Every structure is written in C-alpha cells, then in structure tokens.
Amino acid sequence: EQGYNLNVDLVDDAIGWINRQGSVSPDKPFFVYMAPGAVHAPLHVNQEWIDKFQGQFNQGWDTWREEVFARQLAAGVMPAGTTLSERPHWVPAWDSLSADERRLYSRMMEVYAGFLTHTDAQVGRLVEHVKSLGEFDNTIFVVMSDNGASAEGGPKGSYNEVFFFNFVPESLEENLKRIDLLGTPEAHNHYPWGWA
C-alpha cells in the first residue's frame, strides 16, 4: 500500500489497544509490548525524514565516530579517560574513497538516520498518547534493543542486503543509478559497515 509504514501501523494499533482496554476495564492497568521493525533492514522511510539529514554525514565515518565519541564523553555515557579505539583495519579511511563512494555511502547513512528518527517520533506518539490519558506518571516505559550498529551492509553498503547475504556482488555504478530509491519499498538497502 502506497505510504504504508510498519512503525506507524504498530503505534496506531498500540494506541487503539490502549483505548479499547481502557473502555472495557478502566480501573485495570494495561501492558503494551511493541517491537518496531527499526532499525533493521530494510531501511524504509518517507523522503521527508531522509531529507532532514541531507549532507549531515558528508564528513564521513572517521570524523563522525570522533564526534559521536566526544558527545558520549561529554554526556557521561563513557567514563572520563576512555579513549576511542582505532578504526578497524578492514574499514577504509573515508578520505581514501572516491567522490562517488562518499556520495552513495553518505546517502545510505542519511536514510538510516531518517528511519531511526522516524521510529523515535512514532514512539513519541505513543508516549504523548499515554500523557493525554493522564497515565504518564503511572506508566513504566522499558526500552530495549537487541543490537547496536549493524554490519549487514558489508564494506560497500547494499541496495538490497539479500545480495550481501548471498555473496552477489553489487556495483557502485548500479547503486548510484538507484540512489534515489534508497529508503523506498523498491530497495532493501543497508549502510556500509564503516558507519557501524
């Protein structure tokens, strides 16, 4: 269905369930378990969410990992004195990539970031609904993740990760021709492992 998004649908269903449960048993607590599809591949999200990140990853994964690490230190996520590990030898330096590779790989990360942000907004809709019911202070939210960054896209990312899993080579030229399809139902894309 044109415009369909699993995460929107899951939150719509969760909100509907909370409302129905509240109508049937208003004095009983509710339990909702919601497992969004994000941010596993395929990375599908509307263009407006991808556009929010246009150009934000052009500096490349070497600079990006340093910036993220600095933010984590400043926020206390990493203990003071922690040092950033070396980039793995099997991940190429961003500056060693061609301009076309950098353009494609930046775009792949823009799609991922848009998908993650869209998912966060959907979880936010659920939280706002609980607030609108006056149940926010009486609700426990538990957020868990089964994985962190993913290397499923391989060294060069993938227009269709099934290619990666089946050892089918993808060409930079073909993926550049399809760059505008990344994030759409036409693609089953994933970013290169340099971003992981």
Feature locations, PLM:
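Active-site-proximal cap/lid insertion segments
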Residues: 1-196
